[in-house]
Amino acid sequence: MKNLSFVFIFFVLLSCKNKKQADSVEQTRTSGTVKILVDESFSSIIADQIMVFKSDYKNAEFTTIVGNENKILPTFLNDSVRVIILSRMLTPDEDKVYRSRSIVPKTSRFAIDGISLLTQKDDLDSNITVEEVISILKGTSTTGKQLVFDNAYSSTLRYFKELAQITELPKRGVYTLQSNNDVIKYVSENKNFIGVVGVNWLIANNPDMTSYIAKVKTMGVKDIKGKKGSDAYYRPDQTNLINGIYPFLRNVYIINCEGRDGLGTGFANWLMSPRGQLIVLKSGLGPHKMMSRDFNLKNTN
């Protein structure tokens, strides 16, 4: 019985020691803890960035809260979590919320994402114009094509509602599901539907989706006459994202309202650093800026 009591006391003391060590980690740009709200469209690239960051800085601990834009933004504005990944900047009213607390939001673009339009691989029609997409969103299309989005509160759907200048979806022709994976599955199994999914999500290595992705293809998109990308149909490959020629582009931002020089600031700087931008480049997205490369040319004479 005494031995059991000794073991119990030992583990209690050990847990207290570990907790004390965790609590004593200094809060700096490369150590401590931070919570980050992440738009689910960009969860893959943020997970990659955090993994590499933590491999360099062992005392950095991240808690990510992933959700659609409408879900995570209220949490950010009520001061529960002060770092957020979004596909847009704060509105003037949202910006004032933090400024009223004497905190100036720091916003940094670190990547360029494209929004892919997907159709079944055996669909003969693999191209579409921006005008056609807008007509579907307005409910005036006569082509029979239909759009499927991840969910009713996503940043992707907001993007297209703003594009078409509508506040409500038509009763027919535009539908929302529950997730990006649901969109890919649905399009792979149903003809005449066009799935709308962010490039970062589409190219993420998700083994559960391999068989479904094999049954779909990305559509080429031609922009409105007079705009860049109106001369041909372009797909959302990395070159077209970087050149800005693919019509459906969106920036990816980290917005930091920590109000101090902590891990949130360090991670924001990391995303903009050559190392962070290289991870963006390898992910298939467009980096904020192209990194120059130095070559050592040896004289062999």
What is the predicted function of each stretch?
Residues 9, 114, 251:
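Conserved catalytic motifs of the protein kinase core domain
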Residues 105-108, 113-115:
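Short, glycine-/small- and polar/acidic-enriched structural segments
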Residues 1-14:
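Sec-dependent bacterial lipoprotein signal peptides
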Residues 17-55, 111, 119-301:
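Exported/periplasmic ABC-transporter solute-binding proteins
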Residues 16-106, 286:
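Early extracytoplasmic/lumenal segment of secretory-pathway proteins
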